[in-house]
Regions:
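S-adenosyl-L-methionine
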Residues: 1-15, 19-20, 25-33, 48, ...
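Conserved beta-strand signature within the Rossmann-like core of class I S-adenosyl-L-methionine
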Residues: 328, 366-372
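Mobile active-site "lid"/loop adjacent to the S-adenosyl-L-methionine
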Residues: 306-352
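Conserved proline-anchored active-site loop of SAM-dependent methyltransferases
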Residues: 16-29, 38-43, 204, 292-314, ...
């Protein structure tokens, strides 16, 4: 329905911008028919868009090689991290090997104790004994050195910040070492900025597949829930299934996933229009820039956040991967303290934010195609949104209703039928 709505107002071979790109799914669906621009305030989305949406020549795609990524720089960083964290790495491997396929009992309980008491940045206290030999690296003083110079060798951000619950330590060592490798390749001139974004996008993909969290995002790290020794508890079968999933993810090899994504990308990448471009800006700054108007884009696709959820919390880890800045963190989820919250997510600001957005679209002579899911969590009712649309686009507003299922995280029922609206605002001179 979204593609059809965009097709209905956009001329053949015209151009479309997805102003809140997110996962870039919509932009990808348009790439064969239009010049596509995409924008997102989050840096991880921007990097993914640079890999998926921007044009790359056959020469660039053919020049991508795993030998570079897993070459000298990768080996150098991995060797140093493996030396520094040798004791917890060895203990973790033994725990995962000893568990086998038995997800309860004394052996699993030992792993749970390790999982629940892993040291992390600025919190070395009350850690499992396997961290004793390397505990100084987790001290606030050591972390501060990295905050002052994030390029310090060895790259250690994930190893220090996210080793349990989110990832296993061996996965963190891999993530840090791959990131070090592609940064050094860029710094030494062995790869271009364009290639660096593509290589980094594969690492974002890996994080999504191995993270230990509730739901399909990074907002809530998953805990290992208890089971009774005789498995007679009401939720024991569910908790066992979750334990199995956690162990399966912990055992996954990042390098293998990275290689698979690399091969898939090289085999399936289809170049779109050479003018395709990704932006990483607040939409107000982008739409107010005279250079934007000069692009003569026909249509804006708009799917901003409509609830009071902190969306930046959902993707704080890929954001930190891209920024690689050893951030200040807080709470059990180790969220960035500087995380961004859109005005669309704040009840007192949402309507005015929408009004600003539609005004800027109109000033740029853009058709606007808006997705809106009418769920219980939405801040703005559909009536308010359509009213603002009519304020700027008058009678040239079409509202369509499309039902779909959505995930209702942490609530019952878990899957809920929502009203999905597609609002088309047609610009007329």
């Amino acid at each position: 329905p979204i593609k059809i709505a965009i097709d209905n107002v956009t001329p053949q071979k015209g151009s479309v911008i997805d102003l809140f790109g997110g996962s870039n799914t919509v932009a990808q669906s348009l790439i064969n028919d239009y010049t596509v621009y995409t924008n997102d305030y989050q840096a991880y989305s921007y990097i993914a868009a640079k890999a998926l949406i921007e044009y790359h020549s056959t020469n660039v795609i053919n020049s991508l090689t795993l030998e570079k990524v897993f070459g000298k720089y990768y080996k150098e960083n991995k060797a140093e991290l493996t030396k520094r964290f040798s004791t917890p790495l060895a203990a973790e491997k033994k725990f995962l090997d000893d568990i086998g396929d038995l997800y309860y009992g004394p052996t699993f309980d030992k792993f749970t104790d390790y999982f629940d008491h892993s040291a992390y940045a600025g919190h070395p206290e009350n850690s499992h004994p396997v961290f004793n030999s390397c505990i100084s690296y987790y001290s606030s003083a050591e972390i501060q050195k990295y905050r002052e110079n994030s390029k310090l060798f060895p790259y250690s951000l994930f190893t220090l910040y996210y080793g349990n619950p989110y990832f296993s330590i061996h996965q963190c060592v891999e993530i840090d070492s791959i990131n070090y490798s592609i940064d050094k390749l860029l710094e030494s001139g062995e790869i271009t900025d364009e290639e660096h974004s593509i290589y980094l996008s594969f690492l974002i993909y890996c994080l999504n597949l191995i993270v230990i969290s509730v739901g399909d995002h990074f907002a809530q790290p998953q805990k290992i829930k208890p089971v009774k020794p005789d498995l007679s508890g009401e939720r024991d079968s569910i908790n066992l299934r979750e334990r199995k999933k956690i162990i399966g993810k912990k055992r996954t090899l990042v390098q293998q996933l990275y290689r698979e994504k690399f091969e898939e990308y090289k085999a399936n990448y289809k170049a779109g229009n050479i003018a395709n471009k990704a932006f990483n800006l607040d939409y107000k700054i982008l739409l107010s820039d005279p250079a934007f108007k000069a692009l003569n884009i026909n249509t804006a696709y708009i799917d901003p956040p409509y609830t009071n959820a902190h969306y930046s919390r959902f993707y704080h880890i890929p954001e930190t991967l891209v920024k690689y800045d050893y951030p200040e963190i807080e709470y059990f989820g180790r969220y960035r303290t500087d995380r961004y919250q859109s005005g669309f997510c704040i009840k007192s600001q949402a309507l005015e934010e929408f009004r600003t957005l539609l005004r800027l679209c109109k000033e740029n002579s853009l058709h606007a195609v808006i997705s809106y899911s009418d769920t219980a969590q939405c801040i703005l009712p559909i009536e308010d949104i359509t009213s603002v649309c009519q304020e700027y686009y008058h009678n040239n507003v079409l509202i369509e209703n499309v039902a779909h299922m959505y995930r209702n995280f942490g609530q019952k029922p878990n899957r809920v039928l929502a009203k999905e609206y597609i609002i088309t605002c047609k610009h007329k001179e």
